[in-house]
Design a protein with these regions (language model features):
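ATP-dependent carboxylate activation and anion-phosphoryl transfer catalytic cores
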Residues: 1-201
């Protein structure tokens, strides 16, 4: 684990211990030169990342349970890579949204702030988050496999729902630029244009 992360955890640990804190903890640390800048302490499961963890860490309940007792358990991952994209749904912010999720997507489509009524997924009015309703998750042993799976999943989204792979392409561009500056990545990273949808949707 990078020293910058350890330093922040060491600083917070006494306070968290005093309160017997047993919940999730995530944060942002920006590093420039030798200095680390801490921000965004988050005392909940992180979003994105949690949908990927739910589907890719096979022993997640054990990791959480034993972690709450102070015992570290090594996570076991089903696949090497995961990806998430934001899912949007068109509709009136002041009215309920309703859709039927295809069986093939039920494991991979994470829809917080909604409820299931019979076969329908229902979304209460939400003026805060616009059209964003959740996350689409894909896992794979290569980055290309994750992208290909996501393209197939997007094609299965019900009418009125959409997901955009463009942010993933922007991320691949950042990786490509980092590689040009000599930063090594342990896996082969495809070119950004890989995310272009070619399934006719």
């Amino acid at each position: 684990m990078p020293q910058q992360i350890q330093d922040v955890l060491d600083a917070f640990s006494p306070v968290l211990k005093e309160y017997r804190y047993r919940n999730f903890w995530s944060m942002e640390i920006r590093v420039k030169d030798d200095a680390a800048y801490f921000g965004d302490a988050t005392t909940r499961a992180p979003m994105p990342a949690t949908p990927s963890n739910l589907e890719n860490i096979k022993n997640l309940p054990e990791v959480i349970y034993h972690g709450a007792q102070g015992q570290l358990v090594q996570p076991y991952y089903e696949k090497k890579f995961t990806g998430e994209v934001l899912v949007n749904m068109k509709g009136d912010r002041h009215a309920w949204g309703v859709t039927e999720v295809p069986e093939e997507l039920k494991r991979w489509l994470k829809l917080p702030n909604s409820c299931q009524i019979d076969s329908l997924r229902c979304f209460p009015p939400d003026e805060q988050h616009g059209e964003a309703i959740g996350w689409l998750v894909a896992i794979g042993d290569t980055v290309e496999e994750v992208i290909a799976t996501m393209k197939d999943q997007i094609a299965l989204l019900p009418d009125g729902m959409s997901a955009d792979l463009e942010p993933l392409g922007e991320l691949l561009t950042v990786v490509e630029q980092a590689q040009e500056k000599g930063i090594d990545f342990p896996a082969e990273v495809p070119p950004p244009e890989t995310v272009l949808v070619d399934n006719g949707t």
